[in-house]
């Protein structure tokens, strides 16, 4: 016979977790069709660069719920918007800027979306992937406060699902954030072996999702240098961004270069305030532009001005100048041959 006290207690836990955005929908387990939730209130988000197992507090509370149960008990979804990015382009900085009580909360690379990408690449049924993705957005879109929007910055590994996410949420808007190619290549080179390994891992994932319209075969990719692989991955993301702009239009999707974001933070935040419909007053936007999101290092939590950022870039560029120059010229030729613009349309700031 069913213990009614157990049922009541279980239902209470389910409701408490599903209703509270401080319970982060952290991981998806397709084997059990379950969502792993982890306690991550606003102050934890502020101390965490990315919402990964390595960075979230190891001793925080955790609970596993059936996906269907969690979604059924979730509250109405907040306005949900996205920052899709090419990596190494100040996206973490920008996600931090949207932690604004009363207006919005920024989520920095929630891993549940990466789990769905991995499941998809392992051959999951597309219909099931779409359903779980929709439910993941529902759980990530729980509001942290009354009237607040949620701005999700997925990992760039998730970019292949960007069109599906925007299609599922017709009211959502997106910023497509990128670094200029030379800056991106300098960032990869500065990371040494790990940066060069990362771009090859990105390439493997992009090829699995059919995101390379360049006509190269496996021998071509094997013959490319690490920075050529980095450049071709950057171009693949630019091609995808152009497709998103063409499909969803400038009313919903805008693009922004990281150098413009850093040089004009007030203008960028004002335009994003309008794009995402956050209704922040001019003085609030100005406070964000002059605040820690733009004046402290997003990963090291130390003072880091626009001048410091420029000096760091110039130092990395100088060490690899010849290779970066040659690879940039090669990438421009590849882009021209494939009909890909090096500067995507629908700029956020005109």
Segments (PLM) and residue ranges:
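PAPS-dependent sulfotransferases, especially Golgi type II membrane carbohydrate sulfotransferases
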Residues: 1-74, 216-228, 235-255, 262-350
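PAPS-dependent sulfotransferase catalytic domain
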Residues: 5-6, 11-252, 257-282
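Short, functional N-terminal and low-complexity linear motifs
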Residues: 63-64, 100-106, 127-132, 204-211, ...
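A polyampholytic, Gly/Pro-enriched intrinsically disordered region
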Residues: 125-135, 194-209, 301-310
